[in-house]
Amino acid sequence: MTILYDEGQQAIATESRRVLEARTSTEALLPLLESVGEYHRPFWDTAKEQGWTALALPEAHDGLGLGLIELGLIAHQAGRSLSGAPFLTSGFGAAKAIELYGSDAQKARWLSALASGDSIGAIAFAAGPDTLPAQPDVTFTDDRLSGTARGVSGGLAGNVAIVLANGPGMPVLALVDLTGVERTPVPSFDNSRCVANLTFADATAETLAVGTTAHDAALHIL
């Protein structure tokens, strides 16, 4: 399928490519692939400065109110330049989950912070090789999370995570502040992805969605 970009979208692609070519280099990025636990902070600072972290978030929460096409154009250029940072997991995955399923209080707490790039979001859905498990490894009971979410991209850098958990008789999509959560670095082929195991020990969490809605929400975000 051919996608025809309008003039504004073409300008986003051209300008983001120009900026990234000027501010990134292979020499600067290669060490990040081998160093566990660090993402490309110059790229993240650039994303904040250029408003890319706010691109697809609603204007009511300090976003730019654009869509997935524009976000995809930036992500394409970031990938082209090998910029390593949790760009899509934060600016789309976590942010979109809160925008679509969060309460007014949850939106007020997190969306502006994600739009500014001052907070980073992570997505914790997988269990082993299963990207969207029927029985997640993490359990949700009485607004508490227990268990370990493994291989979470952006987990080392994140301030907030959206977790697919096993609730009482049904799946739960939960929001958790990662302050105080144990994080174990996981070496990967690209260590700038800041992959970590997140261990929850009765961590306070908030509900975003339950039952089939939780499953459908997770599928939509993926």
Please identify what each model-predicted range represents.
Residues E27-A28, L100-Q106, G169-M170:
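Short helix-capping/linker segments at secondary-structure and domain boundaries
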